[in-house]
């Protein structure tokens, strides 16, 4: 009888651990920013000149919808536009959807963007070309960063 109870409890424990593992895996799968930010957020402001000011992570994520033509937006490479990032951003909460064609200038006043893998920033598997200029923005990529000097500052590299 004791053996049967032990076997039953072990089976119950095993089944419970499988259920917990499956739930944990589902919870750990991140949503994409483009599925979460579905309308233009307050942190994405378009000026009269067409240039863009971004003040929060949701505003930066809205670039995905604009460039890739998602969430009711017509695809726009932002050619000739300047994107000014005014605050540090943490993009680690959701997965980034790679940008297709992107032709803008990104400027920041020595701001930092965390949690955005640079290798997934752009969709390099399509025929689009990328022309962009980045100033004063640091991308933190898993304990190291790529720094771009602020406008007017000289780079240490020759």
Please give the residue ranges for each predicted region.
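Generic detector of short, well-ordered, non-transmembrane alpha-helical segments enriched
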Residues: 19-20, 81
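Bacterial N-terminal signal peptides
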Residues: 10-19
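Bacterial N-terminal signal peptides that target proteins for export
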Residues: 1-9
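Surface-exposed repetitive/solenoidal architectures
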Residues: 26-158
